[in-house]
């Protein structure tokens, strides 16, 4: 069984039965929605979209990676397709300010999740969640489920419902078929 503490030495990271306690909270959240069977826990750690897609056996675009940004003192989460990159011009047009990611060392304090395992569920109060339009081309998506070795499989409607997303934004590049062919 994967031991989260083995890979991350901070004393703040506690395990219960070998699984990070935030993963247990996410599991309980989905159990309450009747979706607990959608969570998969693996022995292998998947901390990047590329690795997650390989482990799951899906298209990298189906991995809804979760990026954390700071906006005027609040945290904003944007879920985007696994191969997408943030386009700073689009981000500034959408939000009216430059993109500023939460520094790696502050991710857990800002989101409640460790870097690489940020889940878009049960976030700290006041956190806003948006989905990038790059996700719309898929019927089934995968997100982190609170640990580096767990994912949850959801439809787009389920993802919208479970995240409480404020809506869709268009802040990414390198995901459109034409853009991928040109790069």
What are the functions of these language-model segments?
Residues 2-8, 14-183:
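Extended, low-hydrophobicity, polar/charged segments
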